[in-house]
Amino acid sequence: MTVNYLEQPARPQAPVREAAFHQWTSHNDAVWTFFYRQQTGYLLRFPDMADFEVSADGRRVRGWPAHGAASSTVDHLYLNQVLPLALSRQGKLMLHGSAVDIHGHGVAFIGESGRGKSTLAASFATGGTRFLTDDGLHLEWVGGECQIIPSHPSIRLWEDSQEALIGNTAAVAPALVFTTKSRLLAGPGIPFCDQARPLRRIYFLGEGEASVPTIERLRPAEALICLARNSFLLDIEARDMLAQHFDDVSRLAQLPIYFSLDYPRSYDHLPQVREAIIRHACEQERHAP
C-alpha cells in the first residue's frame, strides 16, 4: 500500500485552535475521532490515545501516541482507521467491509458496526477459507476488472466470538485499552490470502431477523446507496474527491454482484451460513456470461 508511515515519540495532545470539520462518535455517543484541516494536510485526533497527521495527498502519515498510550494502540488505530482514510485521499475506493477468498474469487461482506463482518470472515477462515481483510475493504480496477486488495493479516473479534470460533489457538496481538476486542494474527488456524482477488460478490448484512440464511438481489440504485453509506472518506467536504468517489461507486454499483444477506445471529448457524454463501456465489459464477 502506498502510504509512508512513521511513528513519532509520545507527545501531549495540545489544544487545536481551529474547529474540527468532522467527527466520529462511538456507540455511546462519545467522540471517537476529531478531523482537523492543517496547512499541509489533516490532523486526526483520537482523544487520550494518539494524533495522526496525514499529508494532503494521503501518501505520508505521522503518528504521535498520547502520553501513556501503548504502541499497540497506535498501531491498531493506524491500520484500522487512519490507513483506509489516507488511501481514500489518494482516490482509492475504501469500504467498511470484510472479505474472503472463495475458489480464487473475492467475496465481501459490508454492513454497519455489529452486523458480523469480522465474525463471518473469521468463521470462513477457521473453516479453511482464506480471508483478505477484516475491515478496510480496498477495491481497485485492474484491466477492466475490479479486484480486492489484501489488507493487514489480522482479525478483530469480541471475546465471545473468539471463544466460539477460535479459542486460544491463535496468536494474539497485545491488548488494547479502548476495546475488549482481541486482534488475532493470521496463521495456520486463520489462513490469510496475500494476493489480490477478482471481486465476485458483495453481500450487505442485515439485522439478524431471518430464521434461515436469506439472500436477495439488490438493484444498482440500492447498491449505490449502500456503497456510499459504508465508504471511508477523509475529507467529506472536498468537492473534487467527492465527485471522484461518486463516479467510482456509481461505476461499481453497475456490476451485477450485490445481494442482501440476513441470517440468525447464532454461532451454531454459521456453518449453514457459510454453505449458503459458497453455494450462492458458485452458482452465480457458473451462470455468469
List where the protein language model places each region.
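Long, basic/Gly/Ser/Thr-rich N-terminal segments
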Residues: 1-70, 275-289
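Short linear motifs in intrinsically disordered
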Residues: 29-36, 89-91, 129, 249-250
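A short, structural micro-pattern
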Residues: 38, 57, 94, 195-197, ...
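Extreme N-terminal, non-catalytic leader segments
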Residues: 45-106
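Glycine-rich, often acidic-flanked micro-motifs
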Residues: 98, 102-112, 127-289
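Conserved lysine of the Walker
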Residues: 117
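Post-Walker A alpha-helix
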Residues: 120-121
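Aromatic pocket-lining residues of Rossmann-like dinucleotide-binding sites
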Residues: 124
